[in-house]
Amino acid sequence: MDKLQRDGKEDTSRQRRFLYLLLFQEDLYAIAYDHYFNRSSSFEPMENSSSNDRFSFLTVKRSISRIRQQNGSIIPFVNCDQNRLVGHSRSFYSELVLGGLTAVPEVPFSIRSKHSLEGMNEWTSFRSINSIFPLMEDKIPHSNFLLDIQIPHLTHPEILVRTFRRWIQDAPFLNLLRSVLHEHRNLTISSNLDQLILIASKENKRLSLFLWNYYAYECESLLVPLWKRFSHSRSLPYESFIERTPFYQKIKNIVIFYHKYIKKSLWFLKDPSIHYVKYRERSIIALRGTYLLVKKWRYHLTNFWQCHFHLWLQPYRIYIDEFSNNCFSLLGYLLSVKMKTSVVRIRMLDDSFITHLITKEFDPIAPTTLLIRSLAKERFCDISGHPISRLAWTGLTDDDILDRFDRIWRNIFHYHSGSSKKDGLYRMKYILRLPCAKTLACKHKSTIRVVRERFGSELFTKSFPKERESILLPFSKTRSQRERIWHSDIIQRNPLVNS
């Protein structure tokens, strides 16, 4: 594998033609074995791993050969030598082959991603899902329509094999992949992210995620030609000009002298704004244009996916939303665009006058109702928001109880610190403070008043040291209540938000 990575810098096509040979490398099955038992330590030498207490590498080789010779319904591990199994079921060897099938395609992808990330040694903020929101904060206010797309799920394993055929020229590897996917055909696609594609068991989650990511990459690759047609709209600066009509009139007056240059500049200003964001199974395209243009986009996307993957895409999977009327949910936020009116005094040579400047502002809001519903599901409060004590935690120490409630509050605040309104977050803090006091009161068989008098300011604020005050800017009295902060260390969605 090291040699393959070295050769990948010189000739990438070799990786696509000889992947099948890697399936017979013992190192891959050592990796698969270690992953099967969820071990994080270093791998043992292969001379020790080929014994009966580990696995029979020869049996796996024969299983792969048996797969290629099977016709019809393929059950490759039914005739394995049971004397060599030593207590392991046939699914154990199936997991080894699937582990090899997962590790082999990851080699070209890892080399490709390694080359693309050169020069970004310790910069990891690109993994943050909150990096989506600063982009949307700058771009979405200049769009008026949104296409909310749910990536269509595959219905047949042959479609996935066809997509792999575009970049893998190794026929034996494709045949083996086809056989394995057909074997697991009864485990079809689920909308659950833990059961993404074809293989739903926990042991095969790694292969499932790889297949899903590759399939999502293929879906996005269809949009590249369309993106190139609108390449002039990328990274355009947007400014709010006062008195835009006189501004354009002045440009028209200069057309006489600089006709070609001004024509190109005007074309840039009129160019449509198109922005694309994807997270897991959802894709969002923000457009600036008419409703007819948005309907054409939905029509073309539907036809592209149907022709490319030979599957039927339900129209409800591409939802059209208008910013001026509705808000949409993404990553635990309710996002909308609101109109903001500012009073501006314009001073001229002889006189001055007051005018109103109307601008669009990106408005992310933490969904208070959904957060309360999630807290109610975890039994911190009822559905209306009334606090409930956690009797299961009364056996813990006081510090552990305080730390657990503080940790929940920190996670909620840290994730939703980009909200434009903090009232909902203050309500979450109030809801969590009372269950904390009730839990301590039940433990000490006293009242909430006694608990508050005993702990004082330590109640619910024990894990907020002073050095964190510079980070918690939205709750500082000297800061605006509408200030938004997007933390770049968030790499997964808040588990308390189910939207």
From Swiss-Prot:
<keyword id="KW-0694">RNA-binding</keyword>
<comment type="function">
    <text>Usually encoded in the trnK tRNA gene intron. Probably assists in splicing its own and other chloroplast group II introns.</text>
</comment>
<dbReference type="GO" id="GO:0008033">
    <property type="term" value="P:tRNA processing"/>
</dbReference>
<dbReference type="Pfam" id="PF01824">
    <property type="entry name" value="MatK_N"/>
</dbReference>
<keyword id="KW-0507">mRNA processing</keyword>
<dbReference type="GO" id="GO:0008380">
    <property type="term" value="P:RNA splicing"/>
</dbReference>
<dbReference type="Pfam" id="PF01348">
    <property type="entry name" value="Intron_maturas2"/>
</dbReference>
<dbReference type="InterPro" id="IPR024942">
    <property type="entry name" value="Maturase_MatK_N"/>
</dbReference>
<keyword id="KW-0934">Plastid</keyword>
<comment type="similarity">
    <text>Belongs to the intron maturase 2 family. MatK subfamily.</text>
</comment>
<keyword id="KW-0150">Chloroplast</keyword>
<dbReference type="GO" id="GO:0009507">
    <property type="term" value="C:chloroplast"/>
</dbReference>
<keyword id="KW-0819">tRNA processing</keyword>
<dbReference type="InterPro" id="IPR002866">
    <property type="entry name" value="Maturase_MatK"/>
</dbReference>
<dbReference type="GO" id="GO:0003723">
    <property type="term" value="F:RNA binding"/>
</dbReference>
<dbReference type="GO" id="GO:0006397">
    <property type="term" value="P:mRNA processing"/>
</dbReference>
<dbReference type="InterPro" id="IPR024937">
    <property type="entry name" value="Domain_X"/>
</dbReference>
<protein>
    <recommendedName>
        <fullName>Maturase K</fullName>
    </recommendedName>
</protein>
